[in-house]
């Protein structure tokens, strides 16, 4: 029995998750993600480092494109195997991968415009929406705690990762000599604890080898009451008859904020307020959440049993086309506008910021990390003027920040999850982390006598049990 593990992405970086497990002649890819942002300076999405025709299965931990985003490219290049995932992951991939295809086409179009007439070869997107549709036909779905056979002597079990809807910790069991099994656990992304809607990550697992994410291996999340903080912000703006703009992720964070706003509005703590979700993508994803209520935590299920849909309330409006979106630009008061994505110099968010930042009764709530040169960072630093699409905008509105909504476990959460294992793994491979985060968490684990490796790109290791 020969078992090897090769790291094809998310090594000393946080995108491009892809790890090749070879068991004798069978090849199983654990995630197949896109490299994004700064990681594209070092890695190329069209260099796969494995022949898709030789891969038998892709085991997908969750739908985020840094874990799923190259799957359509694999099919385009000859992959004929199966993608194994949970049902919500498949449905969410339908939205997120098509969105990724559209973004690629737009970026390629503008890049080719800049290349025109310079004698430089035109680029092509990695895949299009038709490629996504074809790929989705080969997604096979399973629930948590089911045994999934990947051929003789290999099985997979999904456990709830608590990161996003349908996210999974992947247990891979491989029949060894005699009656023994080799167990590899791949965490995907481990969720933060005590979040709304989702369960906490399943703990107390056991494995011989562990591939562990380390996104926030050197960070502790704020221990503040998210409800109290958001309620204070909403009341501050609504009592002044202003608008609150909230740029945030379409998947996960938008639904968490809707859930909290539902609590405020249905309890009467906030009155006379309209909430607009200005994102067709977020609207579609919220419908998927409603479809898979069995994946919710006990508190959310209890609300539903009482007849309260926690993702719907009077005054909640989903914007599903550009015409409706333009109408929101005219909204002047007592409205919360949730916009997909980050604080960018373009698109819907730029229009909302332009309309509301010059007004002292309005505000913007930032809920995620902002890069040093970003517009969001400039707002947090208190800049009184920002430039949006070439226009100088005076900032008179309020700027708020909430750091307690992360979907990733922090340093303590990661360590608590690892230390809940019944026995120490023989080896831990730390991935999906960079710089101080991965180094600090490595030191923490080693100080507790764990055997830890930080793999480099394309490193390969035998998984041997003596």
Each model region followed by its residue ranges:
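Core dinuclear metal-dependent hydrolase active-site scaffold
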Residues: 1-53, 134-199, 323-331, 336, ...
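Active-site metal-binding loops of divalent metal-dependent hydrolases
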Residues: 10-11, 32-35, 88, 164, ...
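Pre-active-site segment of Zn-dependent metallo-hydrolases
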Residues: 11-16, 23-81, 85-137, 190-200, ...
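Short helix/loop capping segments that flank catalytic or ligand/cofactor-binding pockets
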Residues: 16, 38, 68-69, 94, ...
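Cap/insert and terminal regions of metallo-dependent hydrolase folds
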Residues: 82, 169, 191-278, 363-368, ...
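Short secondary-structure boundary/capping segments
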Residues: 99-103, 107-111, 226-228, 261-264, ...
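Metallo-beta-lactamase
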Residues: 100-164, 293-332
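Hard-cation-handling environments
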Residues: 233-372, 387
């Amino acid at each position: 029995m020969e078992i090897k593990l090769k790291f094809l992405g998310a090594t000393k970086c946080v995108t491009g998750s892809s790890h090749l497990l070879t068991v004798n002649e069978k090849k199983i890819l654990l995630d197949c993600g896109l490299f994004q942002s700064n990681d594209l300076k070092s890695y190329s999405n069209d260099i796969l480092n494995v022949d898709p025709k030789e891969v038998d299965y892709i085991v997908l931990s969750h739908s985020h494109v840094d874990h799923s985003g190259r799957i359509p490219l694999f099919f385009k290049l000859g992959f004929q195997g199966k993608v194994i995932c949970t049902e919500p992951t498949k449905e969410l991939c339908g939205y997120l991968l098509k969105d990724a295809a559209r973004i690629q086409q737009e970026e390629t179009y503008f890049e080719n415009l800049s290349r025109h007439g310079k004698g430089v070869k035109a680029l092509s997107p990695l895949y299009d929406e038709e490629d996504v549709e074809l790929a989705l036909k080969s997604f096979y779905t399973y629930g948590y705690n089911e045994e999934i056979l990947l051929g003789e002597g290999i099985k997979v079990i999904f456990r709830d990762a608590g990161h996003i809807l349908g996210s999974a910790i992947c247990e891979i069991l491989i029949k060894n000599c005699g009656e023994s099994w080799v167990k590899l656990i791949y965490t995907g992304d481990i969720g933060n604890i005590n979040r709304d809607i989702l369960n906490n990550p399943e703990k107390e697992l056991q494995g011989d080898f562990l591939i562990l994410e380390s996104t926030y291996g050197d960070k502790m999340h704020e221990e503040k009451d998210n409800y109290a903080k958001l309620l204070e912000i909403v009341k501050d703006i609504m009592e002044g008859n202003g608008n609150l703009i909230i740029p945030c992720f379409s998947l996960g964070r938008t639904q968490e904020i809707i859930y909290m706003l539902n609590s405020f509005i249905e309890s009467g703590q906030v009155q006379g307020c309209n909430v607009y979700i200005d994102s067709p993508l977020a609207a579609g994803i919220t419908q998927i959440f409603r479809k898979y209520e069995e994946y919710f935590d006990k508190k959310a299920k209890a609300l539903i049993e009482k007849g309260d849909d926690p993702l719907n309330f009077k005054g909640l409006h989903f914007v599903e086309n550009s015409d409706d979106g333009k109408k929101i630009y005219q909204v002047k008061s007592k409205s919360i506008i949730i916009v997909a994505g980050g604080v960018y110099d373009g698109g819907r968010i730029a229009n909302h910021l332009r309309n509301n930042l010059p007004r002292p009764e309005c505000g913007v709530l930032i809920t995620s990390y902002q890069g040093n040169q970003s517009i969001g960072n400039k707002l947090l630093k208190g800049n009184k003027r920002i430039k949006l699409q070439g226009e100088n905008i005076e900032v008179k509105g309020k700027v708020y920040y909430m750091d307690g909504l992360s979907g990733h476990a922090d340093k303590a959460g990661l360590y608590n999850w690892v230390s809940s294992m019944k026995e120490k793994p023989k080896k831990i491979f730390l991935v999906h982390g960079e710089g101080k985060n991965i180094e600090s968490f490595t030191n923490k684990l080693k100080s507790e006598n764990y055997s830890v490796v930080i793999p480099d790109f394309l490193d390969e290791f035998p998984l041997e049990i003596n």
